[in-house]
Regions:
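Acidic active-site catalytic centers that drive phospho-/nucleotidyl reactions
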Residues: 28, 66, 122
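PAS-family sensory domains
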Residues: 41-117
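PAS-family sensory domain signal
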Residues: 2-59, 99-108
């Protein structure tokens, strides 16, 4: 049975992301440029619109011991030791620390184009 609602789902993605607290970002390691959904920033305790080059690899709002694990995961991806990593980190927000689950994976089709897909879930 074919549904004939005639609606596009893409316009609803920001609202779905916000309600489900799922964030997504795409980051080019070679240029330091990227884009992220507002919820990705919020989950990371960051101000929406901050250049990703000021967040990725720095993670100033991540608890120091978790930050080191996250940097190690990023390094493993950069050096081709893995194409995906996931884990949980504590992120500082206005009320203290919250747990955020992260998934980091290669998004580029070519190894010469180091593009990462960064997802997080609050």
């Amino acid at each position: 049975m074919k549904t004939t609602l005639g609606i596009e789902f893409e316009p609803f993605f920001p609202q779905i992301s916000h309600r489900a607290k799922i964030g997504c970002a795409k980051y080019d390691l070679s240029t330091g440029e990227g884009v992220a959904m507002e919820q990705w920033y919020l989950n990371m305790g960051e101000v929406p619109g901050t250049p990703l080059s000021q967040i990725v690899g720095i993670y100033s709002n991540v608890k120091p011991e978790d930050r080191e694990c996250l940097k190690t995961s990023l390094s493993r991806l950069v050096h081709g030791e893995t194409d995906h990593d996931q884990g949980e980190v504590r992120v500082k927000d206005g009320e203290g620390w919250k747990w955020v689950r992260l998934d980091i994976m290669e998004a580029g089709l070519e190894k010469s184009s180091p593009i990462l897909l960064l997802m997080n879930y609050d």
